[in-house]
């Protein structure tokens, strides 16, 4: 109560921020007449002046009013577009490393030019991050003329660019590209063969467009570069033939019949588990197929690989659906992004799932992959000195932006008041009734000339609706992952009279739907148009625009509620841009996934009480509230998953930093002999301690064992026993020093024989090659640790703490092995001349090129990645037998110490 009164008196944090920024906008507006009077050359010269002032010690904040005024004036002269005051506020919010929530159509692309120009003055480079290549290229071309007029260079970062072109792009003042490409470039740079092969420079300032999509929706899935492991295609095919024989266990089955099912299905967690009966049944199938010995069991260590294949095949058959989760095109399984509805060619699910889906669809099976490098978006974007973002819908996720990224959200007011009519949800009993009502709504809009945008959650649903519209003889366009090549053209015409457009999820996001269509698109169709022709096109568009406004503006139809309220708001936000008229309504049914899994009991209870008849819909605030509560549950669960992914990746991130910094140091220095010397001493002291324990009696010394190891591992043929026999005063410390001195002397002789520069180059090559190989193996070991760590919860241990402890032990092992292997190789190898070093460098280069050719870029399946830790409310691992159901008042198996009902039982 008190906080509400306080907010009314002094305003919310958002209001106070806007009041402060409006004062700076007033300063910028006062500069406008002065900048209008400048000649073009004088305006261009401002960039040189600002850079000089920065070098003399001024900071960006003091330059901001003049820099923003410069960009506004240049935009007016080149594009005839003047930045609104609210866009100036948005630009300042971005410059302050915050998130600007700006409604659709408020000009986010133009707003971004302000902080981009200001921060590019430093010469450190600005990255504008978009959700797809099309938007990166479009925005770069849109703003290129403006930036180049002001003396800035503009680049585009897209996949498959030649390395030299990519390197040049990163040297540009302002670089547009996708989140995936920036992340993969970072990983590739840290796998580079030579320092000059790297393309990125330091990460300074990033403006993330559609920041909610990139930093939240895609944050559950890490970026992974992987390479092919062993070929097991035949096994995938043979296992695939067995899976259709398995029967799902129905949760409603009584205890008497429950044992008859072979697996349980968890739609929420996208997981399957074999029951005890299923385990026995699968074992028999494998024995009959000759894949397992008669007296063997599925869970014996020798059959871990079989279990992995069974689990992957089962998930492929019962959880992953064609035209929803993936499409089959040109004999290839292509993943469909669940957030954007776009296909992701070249991306593959991990853990053998992709191969299992390929076996299921009967297409060519590609080799399983091994992780070579990996990072989450959270940890990648936190590498930037300054990070900011803009979107139409961020306020619902403001807490997550603040807690994960340290970014505050500021809601920017619209330039004109919002005029869209958001109508209440209509809920039907069946999907068929829902689609019939949608068709009727579309017919009505089409007859009165009102354009309609229909949002669906999957390709399958968009094609189902498309077929229904064809039967009703209603002309329409489909915008989904299968047809995104025509995306810009379809979106450009989506606002024309009577246009009906079906869009999967958020396909087409980032492109405004203009009422009456796009006059620019019509002008682009003309070859070398005259000014008269352009004016004629504009006049024709104005008539069409006014007619569409009179019909009610763009009407949005949602065919299902998404898991996140934010994505529903994004769909609604396509209508009512810049104060235009518009409307929106969601049509739901009790058969929708969200309703079925999360909201069915409460809502269906309401509908039964009301005595619903076929074709009748319910529209009530209670129903809308129940649906929003279901969405909040899912949002909370997804936040937990993302937070958990980050907590686990933070452990790996600390290790990644150490390895990448070491690698960076190795590539940038010419002489690592001092490092090799320290390592040699440490390794020999460690080996000495194994055979001659500290402060021990001579009877406990294993001199013979030490002699053998020194000869075998370090090519040191030392008469240790003879030394001891001939010198009574030779004790433990003296002997250790004598061995180290002998090793140093032998290495010095090697250096003299081959030459100092040859050996320095060889040391560096050996160190890098060994580090890369061990890091790859370490990543595989970390993956395996992650997959089984959640089982520690059953032993009353905290999985997260166990993961930290064991991963630290693994990493210590990696560093110890690195030192030992490098010292051993350098001691044993016979380097004759520079050609030997060059041969090794060439071999390493060829291996690197071959690995690069065979690399797969993955955005790993999130649920598959997160089979662990406290966030895993189910027993995800196939190695666990079906456990009894956890009581609501019992301790949660995750190891948090809370009761189950207060922890994962809430979800």
Swiss-Prot record:
List where Basic and acidic residues composition bias occurs. 836-853, 873-888
Which keywords appear in this protein's UniProt record, sorted alphabetically? ATP-binding, Cell inner membrane, Cell membrane, Cytoplasm, Membrane, Metal-binding, Nucleotide-binding, Protein transport, Translocase, Translocation, Transport, Zinc
What are the GO MF terms of this UniProt record?
Answer: ATP binding; metal ion binding; protein-exporting ATPase activity
- Enzyme class name: translocase
Q: Name one Pfam family in it.
A: SecA_PP_bind
Q: Which CDD domains match?
A: DEXDc_SecA, SF2_C_secA
Q: Which reaction does it catalyse?
A: ATP + H2O + cellular proteinSide 1 = ADP + phosphate + cellular proteinSide 2
Locate the region Disordered: 834-907
Sites binding Zn(2+) sit at: 892, 894, 903-904
As for membrane topology, the entry says: Peripheral membrane protein
* Enzyme Commission number, as recorded: 7.4.2.8
Look up the record and name the cofactor or cofactors this protein needs.
Zn(2+)
Q: An example of a Gene Ontology BP annotation on this entry?
A: protein import
User: What family is this protein classified in?
Assistant: Belongs to the SecA family.
Q: What does this protein do?
A: Part of the Sec protein translocase complex. Interacts with the SecYEG preprotein conducting channel. Has a central role in coupling the hydrolysis of ATP to the transfer of proteins into and across the cell membrane, serving both as a receptor for the preprotein-SecB complex and as an ATP-driven molecular motor driving the stepwise translocation of polypeptide chains across the membrane.
Report quaternary structure and partners.
Monomer and homodimer. Part of the essential Sec protein translocation apparatus which comprises SecA, SecYEG and auxiliary proteins SecDF-YajC and YidC.
Name assigned to this protein = Protein translocase subunit SecA
This protein's species is Aliivibrio fischeri (strain ATCC 700601 / ES114) (Vibrio fischeri)
- Quick one: which gene encodes this? secA
């Amino acid at each position: 109560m008190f906080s509400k009164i306080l907010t009314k008196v002094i305003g919310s944090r958002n209001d106070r921020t806007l009041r402060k920024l409006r004062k700076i906008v007033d300063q910028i507006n006062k500069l406008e007449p002065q900048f209008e009077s400048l000649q073009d050359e004088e305006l261009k010269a401002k960039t040189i002046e600002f850079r000089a002032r920065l070098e003399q010690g001024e900071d960006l904040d003091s330059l901001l009013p003049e820099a923003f005024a410069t960009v506004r004036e240049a935009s007016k002269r080149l594009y005839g577009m003047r930045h609104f005051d609210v866009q100036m506020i948005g630009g300042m919010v971005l410059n302050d490393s915050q998130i600007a929530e700006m409604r659709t159509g408020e000009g986010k692309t133009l707003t971004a030019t302000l902080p981009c120009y200001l921060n590019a003055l430093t010469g450190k480079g600005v990255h504008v991050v978009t959700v797809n290549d099309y938007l990166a290229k479009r925005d770069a071309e849109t703003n290129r003329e403006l930036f180049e007029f002001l003396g800035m260079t503009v680049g585009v970062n897209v996949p498959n660019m030649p390395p030299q072109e990519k390197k040049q792009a990163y040297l540009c003042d302002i670089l547009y590209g996708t989140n995936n490409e920036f992340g993969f470039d970072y990983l590739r740079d840290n796998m580079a063969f030579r320092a000059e092969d790297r393309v990125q420079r330091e990460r300074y300032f990033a403006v993330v467009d559609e920041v909610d999509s990139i930093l939240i929706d895609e944050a559950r899935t890490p970026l992974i570069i992987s390479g092919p492991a062993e070929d097991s295609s035949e096994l995938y095919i043979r296992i695939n033939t067995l899976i259709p024989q398995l029967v799902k266990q129905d949760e409603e089955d009584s205890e008497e019949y429950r044992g008859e099912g072979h697996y349980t299905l968890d739609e929420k967690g996208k997981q399957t588990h074999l029951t005890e009966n299923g385990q026995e049944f699968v074992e028999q199938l494998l024995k009959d197929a000759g894949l397992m010995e008669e007296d063997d069991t599925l869970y014996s260590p020798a059959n871990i690989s079989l279990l992995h294949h069974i689990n992957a095949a089962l998930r492929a058959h019962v959880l992953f659906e064609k035209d929803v989760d993936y499409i089959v095109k040109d004999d290839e399984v292509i993943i469909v992004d669940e957030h954007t509805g776009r296909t992701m060619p070249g991306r593959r699910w991990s853990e053998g799932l992709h191969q299992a889906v390929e076996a299921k669809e009967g297409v060519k099976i590609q080799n399983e992959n091994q992780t070579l490098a990996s990072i989450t978006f959270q940890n990648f974007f936190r590498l930037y000195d300054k990070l900011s973002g803009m979107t139409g819908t961020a306020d619902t996720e403001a807490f997550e932006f603040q807690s994960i990224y340290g970014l505050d959200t500021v809601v920017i007011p619209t330039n004109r008041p919002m005029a869209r009519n958001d109508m209440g949800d209509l809920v039907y009993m069946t999907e068929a009734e829902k689609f019939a009502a949608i068709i009727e709504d579309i017919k009505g809009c089409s007859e009165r000339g009102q354009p309609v945008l229909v949002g669906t959650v999957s390709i399958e649903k968009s094609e189902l609706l498309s077929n229904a519209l064809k039967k009703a003889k209603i002309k329409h366009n489909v915008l989904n992952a299968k047809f995104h090549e025509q995306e810009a053209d379809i979106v450009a015409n989506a606002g024309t009279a009577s246009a009906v457009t079906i869009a999967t999820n958020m396909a087409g996001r980032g492109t405004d739907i203009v009422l009456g269509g796009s006059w620019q698109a019509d002008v682009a169709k003309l070859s070398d148009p005259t000014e008269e022709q352009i004016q004629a096109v504009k006049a024709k568009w104005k008539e069409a625009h006014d007619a569409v406004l009179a019909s009610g503006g763009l009407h949005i139809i949602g065919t299902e509620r998404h898991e996140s309220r934010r994505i529903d708001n994004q769909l609604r936000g396509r209508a009512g841009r810049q104060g235009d008229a518009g409307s929106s309504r969601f049509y739901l049914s009790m058969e929708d996934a969200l309703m079925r899994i999360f909201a069915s009991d409460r809502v269906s209870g309401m509908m039964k009480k009301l005595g619903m008849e076929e074709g009748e819909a319910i529209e009530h605030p209670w129903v809308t509230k129940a649906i929003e509560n279901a969405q909040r549950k899912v949002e909370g669960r997804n936040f937990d998953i993302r937070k958990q992914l980050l907590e686990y990746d933070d452990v790996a991130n600390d290790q990644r930093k150490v390895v990448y910094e070491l690698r960076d140091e190795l590539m940038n220095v010419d002489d690592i002999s001092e490092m090799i010397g320290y390592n040699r001493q440490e390794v020999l002291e460690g080996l000495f301690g194994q055979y001659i324990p500290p402060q021990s009696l001579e009877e406990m010394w294993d001199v013979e064992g030490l002699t053998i190891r020194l000869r075998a591992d370090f090519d040191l043929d030392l008469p240790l026993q003879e030394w001891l026999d001939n010198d009574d005063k030779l004790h433990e410390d003296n002997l250790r020093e004598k061995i180290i001195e002998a090793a140093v002397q032998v290495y010095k002789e090697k250096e003299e024989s081959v030459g100092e520069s040859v050996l320095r180059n060889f040391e560096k090559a050996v160190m890098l090659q060994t580090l890369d190989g061990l890091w790859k193996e370490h990543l595989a070991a970390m993956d395996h640790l992650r997959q089984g760590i959640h089982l520690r919860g059953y032993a009353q241990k905290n999985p997260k703490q166990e993961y930290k402890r064991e991963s630290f032990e693994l990493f210590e092992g990696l560093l110890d092995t690195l030192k030992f292997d490098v010292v051993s190789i350098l001691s044993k190898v016979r380097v004759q001349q520079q050609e030997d070093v060059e041969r090794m460098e060439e071999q390493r280069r060829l291996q690197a090129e071959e690995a690069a050719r065979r690399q797969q870029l993955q955005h790993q399946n999130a649920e598959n990645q997160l089979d662990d830790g406290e966030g895993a409310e189910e027993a995800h691992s196939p190695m666990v037998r079906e456990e009894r159901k956890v009581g609501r008042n019992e301790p949660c198996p995750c190891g948090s110490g809370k009761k189950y009902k207060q922890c994962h039982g809430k979800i």
